[in-house]
C-alpha cells in the first residue's frame, strides 16, 4: 500500500509517537538513541528523510527491560507498547510504541493488528572479543530466522515449494512442526533470544550489539560511542543520537551526508491494511478485504 497521498499525515502521526516515547523516557529516566534512517535524518535533514516511512530507536537492554515492565501497569493514553510477550500474533522480537487509535497490518503472511508505530530495538551487551561477538550474532540470526519461519503463514503452494530446493528443506521442516505447535515453538524461540540477550552485563561490556538489526556485523560496535547522547534538531523537536554520532553513522553508512541515488529513495516497509482514523477488529477488517 502506497502512502504518498497521506505522507504528511503519516509523518505527523509517527512524529507524535516519537514525542510520546521521548516523554516516557524522560519521565522514567530511560536511555535511548535514534538509529538507522532516523539518525541519518536527524544529522542530515534535521528531521525525517523525505522518503523514509518509519522511526527507529535503540534502548540499552536494562532500560528496554524497564520500559517493558513499566508498560505492564502504566497507562500511556492512546499509546501502547506492543511486545512479543503481550501479543501472541506479534511476529517480531523487538517492540513498538503503537498508536492504538490507528490500524495497521504490515504483512498478509504475518497477520498482526497493530497501529502506526515507532520501532524500539534492544541494544545488548556482547563479548569483548570481536570474533566471539560475531559468532553470537550468527546464533541470534539463526534463531530469528526460525522465528520468522514459525510466524509466517504461507499459502499451500509456497509451503510445498520449499521442498524444491535442498537449502529450504530445514525451513519446510520448521513450518511443518509449526503448523501443529506454532505457539509453543514461538515461545521457545523467544526464550532462547532472551537467554542470549542477557548473557553479558551491559554495564561491564565494552561492545554492544543490535541483535535484530539489518546491518550484519556492523551491528556490533563499541559501547563508548553511546555516551549520554548528543542532541539534534528533528522537525519541531530534538532527539538524541549516540554521543559519538559521526563515528557511529560512518561505521554504518560511510558518507552519510551524501544522498543515495534517486532510484534508492523509496519507502521500504510493507502495509497490507491501513486505517489512520481508528482501531478496527479482525471482523471489521475482513469485511473490507
For the regions a language model picked out, list residue spans one by one:
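Conserved catalytic core of two-metal-ion nucleotidyltransferases
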Residues: 2-26, 68-128, 146-164, 168-254, ...
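Active-site nucleotide-donor binding segment shared across nucleotidyl transfer reactions
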Residues: 22-55, 59-65, 224, 251-252
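A short secondary-structure junction signal
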Residues: 129-135
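Short, His- and charge-rich active-site/binding loops that engage polyanionic ligands
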Residues: 137-142
Amino acid at each position: 500500500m502506497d502512502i504518498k497521498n497521506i505522507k504528511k499525515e503519516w509523518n505527523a502521526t509517527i512524529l507524535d509517537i516519537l514525542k510520546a516515547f521521548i516523554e516516557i523516557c524522560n519521565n522514567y529516566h530511560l536511555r535511548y538513541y535514534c538509529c538507522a534512517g532516523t539518525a541519518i535524518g536527524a544529522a542530515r535533514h534535521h528531521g525525517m528523510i523525505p522518503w523514509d516511512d518509519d522511526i527507529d530507536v535503540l534502548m540499552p537492554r536494562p532500560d528496554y527491560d524497564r520500559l517493558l515492565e513499566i508498560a505492564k501497569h502504566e497507562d500511556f493514553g492512546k499509546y501502547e507498547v506492543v511486545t512479543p510477550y503481550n501479543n501472541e500474533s506479534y511476529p517480531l522480537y523487538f517492540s513498538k510504541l503503537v498508536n492504538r487509535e490507528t490500524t495497521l497490518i504490515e504483512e498478509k503472511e504475518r497477520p498482526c493488528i497493530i497501529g502506526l508505530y515507532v520501532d524500539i530495538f534492544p541494544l545488548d551487551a556482547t563479548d569483548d572479543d570481536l570474533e566471539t561477538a560475531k559468532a553470537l550474532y550468527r546464533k541470534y540470526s539463526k534463531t530469528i530466522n526460525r522465528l520468522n519461519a514459525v510466524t509466517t503463514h504461507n499459502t499451500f503452494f509456497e509451503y510445498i515449494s520449499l521442498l524444491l530446493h535442498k537449502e529450504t528443506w530445514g525451513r519446510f521442516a520448521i513450518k511443518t512442526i509449526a503448523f501443529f505447535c506454532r505457539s509453543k515453538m514461538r515461545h521457545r524461540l523467544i526464550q532462547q533470544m532472551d537467554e542470549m540477550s542477557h548473557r553479558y552485563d551491559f554495564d561491564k561490556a565494552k561492545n554492544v550489539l543490535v541483535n535484530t538489526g539489518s546491518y550484519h556485523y556492523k551491528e556490533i560496535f563499541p559501547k563508548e560511542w553511546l555516551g549520554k547522547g548528543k542532541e539534534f534538531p528533528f522537525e519541531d523537536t530534538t532527539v538524541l543520537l549516540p554521543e559519538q554520532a559521526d563515528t557511529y553513522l560512518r561505521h554504518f553508512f560511510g558518507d552519510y551526508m551524501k544522498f543515495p541515488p534517486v532510484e534508492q529513495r523509496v519507502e521500504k516497509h510493507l502495509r497490507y491494511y491501513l486505517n489512520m482514523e481508528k482501531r478496527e477488529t479482525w471482523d471489521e477488517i475482513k469485511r473490507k478485504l
